[in-house]
């Protein structure tokens, strides 16, 4: 009886210990120290639907703070100090994390205890080689522009593009080789704007089932689905937005013409630089049945209308004036502008990302010279 009682007590103690340990590792604890701020507030933020929200906050006491919570999968959060510019992005995963935060240079902050964060830091260290090269080349580019040396400008631009392409290749190879890491999924969705449908298919195929529940993996799958609906050969998704006087205009109302669905904004420098090329194409081919359907990602109606007038954009323009939340942009998977899609007279997509001479050549192919 005594042995049975002793065994029961021992079992109860062991279960208690296991229970306590489970509670400690069930979620995450962030223990942080701040250099340069003994008081104030720490804000833990995360990105949801393109917007930054505050997930938690805690008061700093004697330069220290502690945050607790739980995540289903490792995920990037942003640590921000109230009334201090900038934020520090880092991977949170369940367990105990230790942070060293520097109030005067928050981007130099560090985190230990997160395997995913360690992997991200290692990647960033290797990627920095390319960033340093591009920074140096940008300095050379600025000097060449100031001295009006067009030959030097061209040489530097070519060199910069070469390094940028090498960086993109490095990142893509990292993603494809590390499919078991949520970091790869995070990097992939962060660079998704630059990936074709074929790229995304390969990346999604490389993702390990063990990280299938990651929000980043799910977003990659959604991205692939969207792009598959707007690739050449597909019927252009229908949408209706208001024009500059508030009248609803549907894309389908232009059926029977070759249409360039052109995503742009008044605040977008590259868009404004490309507008003269679109104007030239419109003037050359409008009489042959070509038109443009301008979709603006503006939020300010006056600035939108002013840009239309200044750039001489004499075609139909629509917008919902909610910036990147633009319904049509989301429908077409637009993550950067300028972006465009060329439709034939039946409303079928026959090209995309056509700029400058490429647009002219494609229109000559479709409508003749």
What is each stretch, according to the model?
Residues 272-311, 321-330:
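Structural microenvironment flanking redox-active thiols in thiol-disulfide oxidoreductases
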Residues 1-32, 368-369:
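Bacterial Sec-dependent N-terminal signal peptides
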Residues 20-169:
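A non-transmembrane, solvent-exposed segment enriched in polar/low-complexity residues
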Residues 218-252, 315-316, 361-369:
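N-terminal "domain-start" segment that seeds a small globular fold
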Residues 190, 311-313, 320-368:
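Thiol/disulfide oxidoreductase modules built on the thioredoxin-like
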Residues 85-87, 97-99, 103, 153, ...:
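N-terminal targeting signals for export/organelle localization
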Residues 255-256, 263-280:
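Conserved redox-active cysteine motifs that mediate thiol-disulfide chemistry
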